[in-house]
């Protein structure tokens, strides 16, 4: 039986589903393609035609990770193939640090490398310092001719010169130096940067930490042997690639060593700072930064990790059988440790010293030789040089005798042996015979009569010294470096002793701080108020608290807490003022302002693109950019303060209301008040403003708010007919205004949105008005006081109270907000008052959400209030509002706020807008999401671009 199939009906019924599946497949394909494109942008493909071994490939990837995509063609054998591959990657690495369209100088590099890649922005300084350089130019010209004959589309010429870098006049802001610093040295590079006007240079050189201690060594990954010869300024270092027939490299050791011994160089008014960034695969990446800012003298510390010598110690042995000349020999730390452990146990005091040395030599030989186990040769330790083996054994033997002698003397010093011995040990030995420190008498005689040989054996020689895991280089910010002591063997023991003394001093200070910290924590436990507050948590009545002055010792934990809170707020305001001055001073300096004009307006243009509050005022009243904001103060050479029309000054957002200096000064000497603090802790919309209206008595009370918007709301509630009257502004003030201009006395102080105030600021206001009690209104679960300086650690910022009343009924929030907030709170604070809150609102459904693609899909209405979590989204909405002619500037300033700015606001219709799907921690923070969800009375709309992981708003309302 045949069955008919209605194809059109099937398509109409299932076409939508099929289309949906097709869209999913396309979306996944596009997503994968975008990921591949993104990876290709982040990585550079490097074609290596040289043959590399698997170990060399691993070394390359260990150096650069996934930053480069290595394409190995394995076409032909080439000398030092890994070094060549790394050199190409080093070019890409250094060039990628600079703007892609700016010109760049290459000191001592190959112009062919850039020309073959059509990188026309790079000028190469390729001086002819010898026949090798001249031959390289001929080879590059040959390659260029070959390329021009094979490619018809090349019409450009290479950009290079044969002048020394310091003699070339080409100007650029950036430069690279790939293995070109060997012949120039650090000072030469700085001079080259100065002649070119270069601000930042990045470069690479081959370096081994052992070069600072040994005369020869091997760079194993690069298969290169190095050797130093000569002395003083004529000392050179030679690089030979092993098992290869190539020209070797000879460079001045003074030039190469300067990259590890100098950090700062000054030419005229320009200071150059060298920073060593990475030392891996025996290639060191460094950068040199030039600055014309005034730099005070300081001591710089720079650490460099020597991974190839960190597991060694230096054993000092006699050189040429001369007791007055010793040299260090590197021996593996494990070898020395095991030899000492075994030899110390087997030491025979009554035997001849030669017998003990034989025992040590036997152990040393066993720990640094080849062992055959089951027919397989296994290397135990590292084999010593045949000329140094017996002297290392002798040095370890003498060191062992010395330790036994010190232990014996130490044991002997525990007994009292009369005044003669006491005199000897204090004035001849210097306090201890065990340590053999030089006493005053012996030191004087040894200096006057050196032939008496009054110094001890230990005073003359050092057998063991740790080479170091990390060397801490110190350098003054002048061209003279203190690191040259690295090359002086006479200073090695002195440096070790200084390091030991410094370490012991740090340990003592650390122990002292730990004891002080314990005492402070015990005192802190006594003054801290528990966070797990319960309902009806009235604290027991206490005796009246005396006032505490700044200079007086607190008489109790609560007085101390209030005293420190006010002091912390004063310090916090002082820090913000210093930050504002520092930022403006930096902007003034880098813009090249001199009192009449700004020489570098491009800097201001760059800053203005990020923050349109940054501007420059010219003498005569002109502004660099159209003035959008009113500024109270400005900054120039005379500092931060009010300015006149005939002055040149810069401004930023801190100049709109610069009151931190006054706040800090006015609160610094205040006494801690002894008044009782009560908190009305209510849910959002519980009627805190109404409660303030009911509780206030104009004759005896004052009202202080956390922000200007709250003050306006309270004035409208208490003085509905004339909120701008003089009496309204006198009794209802912001906390900042109260501290800056003072307050009249009152019996009770009412504080609105107290959680937004620093605890010390609230106490300072109470101290000014001499009130007997404080009634604070707020919500402990909404946004609290936040520091504007992430580096300033707050200890006393949270509000502390003597009693608290909890209100769990709201008159503002609709019914669906109740369940949304309860969903928000689940899994968080189980003692939250919002888990059992109730609403008297008659609105049952108010929440909606909608996904948008861009800010252009946001339609702004005069009847709605717009919220954002970030200032960036707020700026985007403000820009979008300009597309609506009916929305004036006053409306925009009043109806577009961040959630933080909108705390305490109550509106009919609220719209929360998120314009990015990237990470935003504020959408994962309960207190911010709670404020956002509880501002409206009738409707709440959530407009968002893309899904955001961990979005609490979407989870609560969906």
Swiss-Prot record:
PROSITE patterns: ALPHAVIRUS_MT (PS51743), PSRV_HELICASE (PS51657). The keyword Hydrolase applies. It is found in: Host endoplasmic reticulum membrane. It is a peripheral membrane protein. GO terms for molecular function: ATP binding; helicase activity; hydrolase activity, acting on acid anhydrides; mRNA methyltransferase activity; RNA binding. Residues 529-557 are annotated as: Disordered. Residues 71-260 form the Alphavirus-like MT domain. Residues 680-943 are annotated as: ATP-dependent helicase. Disulfide bonds: none annotated. InterPro entries: (+)RNA_virus_helicase_core_dom, Alphavirus-like_MT_dom, CMV_1a_C, P-loop_NTPase. Involved in the virus replication. Contains a helicase domain and a methyltransferase domain. The methyltransferase domain is probably involved in viral RNA capping. Involved in the formation of ER membrane spherular invaginations in which RNA replication complexes form. Interacts with RNA-directed RNA polymerase 2a. This is Replication protein 1a. The lineage of its organism: Viruses, Riboviria, Orthornavirae, Kitrinoviricota, Alsuviricetes.
């Amino acid at each position: 039986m045949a069955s008919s199939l209605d194809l059109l009906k099937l398509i109409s019924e299932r076409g939508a589903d099929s289309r949906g599946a097709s869209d999913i497949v396309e979306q996944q394909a596009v997503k994968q393609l975008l990921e591949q494109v993104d990876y290709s942008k982040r990585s550079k493909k490097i074609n290596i035609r040289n043959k590399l071994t698997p170990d060399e490939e691993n070394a390359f990837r260990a150096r650069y990770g996934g930053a480069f995509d290595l394409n190995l063609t394995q076409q032909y054998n080439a000398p030092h193939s890994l070094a060549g591959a790394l050199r190409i990657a080093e070019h890409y690495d250094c060039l990628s640090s600079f703007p892609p369209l700016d010109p760049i100088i290459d000191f001592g590099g190959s112009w062919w490398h850039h020309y073959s890649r059509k990188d026309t922005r790079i000028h190469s300084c390729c001086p002819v310092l010898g026949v090798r350089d001249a031959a390289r130019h001929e080879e590059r010209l040959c390659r260029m001719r070959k390329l021009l004959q094979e490619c018809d589309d090349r019409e450009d010429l290479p950009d290079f010169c044969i002048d020394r870098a310091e003699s070339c006049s080409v100007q650029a802001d950036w430069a690279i130096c790939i293995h070109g610093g060997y012949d120039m040295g650090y000072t030469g590079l700085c001079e080259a940067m100065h002649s070119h006007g270069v601000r930042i240079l990045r470069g690479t050189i081959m370096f081994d930490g052992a070069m600072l201690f040994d005369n020869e060594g091997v760079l194993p990954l690069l298969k290169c042997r190095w050797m130093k010869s000569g002395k003083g300024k004529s000392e050179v270092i030679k690089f030979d690639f092993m098992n290869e027939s190539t020209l070797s490299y000879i460079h001045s050791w003074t030039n190469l060593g300067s990259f590890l011994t100098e950090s700062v160089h000054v030419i005229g008014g320009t200071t150059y700072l060298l920073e060593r960034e990475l030392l891996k695969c025996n290639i060191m990446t460094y950068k040199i930064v030039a600055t014309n800012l005034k730099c005070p003298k300081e001591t710089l510390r720079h650490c460099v990790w020597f991974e190839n010598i960190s597991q060694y110690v230096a054993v000092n042995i006699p050189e040429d059988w001369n007791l007055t000349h010793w040299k260090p020999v590197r021996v593996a730390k494990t070898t020395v440790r095991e030899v000492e452990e075994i030899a110390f146990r087997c030491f025979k005091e009554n035997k001849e010293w030669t017998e003990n040395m034989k025992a040590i030599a036997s152990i040393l030989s066993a720990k640094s030789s080849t062992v055959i186990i089951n027919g397989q040769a296994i290397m135990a330790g590292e084999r010593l040089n045949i000329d140094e083996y017996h002297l290392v054994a002798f040095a370890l033997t003498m060191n062992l005798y010395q330790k036994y002698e010190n232990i014996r003397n130490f044991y002997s010093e525990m007994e009292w042996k009369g005044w003669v011995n006491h005199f000897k040990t204090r004035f001849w030995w210097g306090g201890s015979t065990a340590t053999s420190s030089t006493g005053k008498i012996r030191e004087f005689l040894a200096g006057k009569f050196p032939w008496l040989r009054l110094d001890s054996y230990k005073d003359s020689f050092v057998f063991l010294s740790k080479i170091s895991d990390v060397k801490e280089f110190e350098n003054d910010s002048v061209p003279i470096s203190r690191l040259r002591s690295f090359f002086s063997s006479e200073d090695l023991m002195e440096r070790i002793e200084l390091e030991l003394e410094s370490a012991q001093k740090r340990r003592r200070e650390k122990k002292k701080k730990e004891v002080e910290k314990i005492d402070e924590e015990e005192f802190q436990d006594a003054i801290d108020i528990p966070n797990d507050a319960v309902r009806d948590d009235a604290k027991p009545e206490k005796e009246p608290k005396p006032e505490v002055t700044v200079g007086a010792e607190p008489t109790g934990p609560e007085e101390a807490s209030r005293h420190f809170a006010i002091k912390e707020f004063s310090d916090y305001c002082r820090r913000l003022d210093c930050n504002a001055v520092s930022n403006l001073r930096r902007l003034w300096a880098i813009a090249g302002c001199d009192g009449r004009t700004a020489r570098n307006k491009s800097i201001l243009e760059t800053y203005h693109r990020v923050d349109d509050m940054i501007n420059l005022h010219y003498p005569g009243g002109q502004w660099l950019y159209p003035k959008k904001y009113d500024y109270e103060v400005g900054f120039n050479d005379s500092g931060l303060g009010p300015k006149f029309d005939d002055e040149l000054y810069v401004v930023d957002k801190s100049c709109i209301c610069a009151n931190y200096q006054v706040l800090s000064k006015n609160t610094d000497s205040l006494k801690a008040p002894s008044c009782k603090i009560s908190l009305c802790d209510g849910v959002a919309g519980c009627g805190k403003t109404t409660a303030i209206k009911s509780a206030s008595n104009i004759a005896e009370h004052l009202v202080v708010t956390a922000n200007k918007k709250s003050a306006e709301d309270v004035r409208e509630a208490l003085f509905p007919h004339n909120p701008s009257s003089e009496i309204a502004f006198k009794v209802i003030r912001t906390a900042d205004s109260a501290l800056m201009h003072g307050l009249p006395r009152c019996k009770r102080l009412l504080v609105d949105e107290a959680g937004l105030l620093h605890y010390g600021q609230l106490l300072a206001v109470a101290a000014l008005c001499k009130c007997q009690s404080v009634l604070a209104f707020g919500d402990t679960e909404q946004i609290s006081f936040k520091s504007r300086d992430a580096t300033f650690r707050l200890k006393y910022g949270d509000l502390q109270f003597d009693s608290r009343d909890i209100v769990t009924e709201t008159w503002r929030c609709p019914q669906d907000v109740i369940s949304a907030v309860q969903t928000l709170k689940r899994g968080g604070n189980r003692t939250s008052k919002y888990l059992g809150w109730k609403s008297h609102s008659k609105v049952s459904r108010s929440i909606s959400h909608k996904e948008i693609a861009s800010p252009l899909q946001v339609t702004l209405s005069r009847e709605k209030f717009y919220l954002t979590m970030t200032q960036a989204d707020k700026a985007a909405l403000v820009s979008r509002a300009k597309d609506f002619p009916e929305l004036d500037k006053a409306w925009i300033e009043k109806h577009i706020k961040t959630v933080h700015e909108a705390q305490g606001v109550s509106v009919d219709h609220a719209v929360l807008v998120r314009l990015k799907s990237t990470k935003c921690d504020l959408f994962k923070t309960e207190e911010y999401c709670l404020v956002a969800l509880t501002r409206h009375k009738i409707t709440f709309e959530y407009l968002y671009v893309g899904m955001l992981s961990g979005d609490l708003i979407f989870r609560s309302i969906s």
